[in-house]
């Protein structure tokens, strides 16, 4: 199960890295989906509540699908100015390894590594957004990462937050238009 947790943690990190590097709806949705799959795999492998893990999976997938409906079309990957976010993606994973440290030998520790990496990178992205759709995608990813640090109720709350943020409109309304 440790290998499954490790695959989940890496997949979650790759997903949140995509959220961090994307500015358009497809990139955000695919990143959110990848993060969801990774965190769900890690949660199941670490022995978390099966119902909580299922709720996390459902909420993340619904949030990702809802993110496809509005915002800037396309992928929006690696736009000018995104190099610091790419560097941050690598550094955050290394920082999460140091932070989790000695508990990496067990599936729970590996799952925690993925959740910490997701939460840190999503938080960094949330603080640097320029568009509302990026903020909503990063917020949903942050909710999933923080929820994955807990058990049943935290996983369900994270799923609800991801769906709620996915349901919000990403287009800014302009007064007078």
Predicted features by range, described:
Residues 1-177:
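Alpha-helical transmembrane segments of multi-pass membrane proteins predominantly involved
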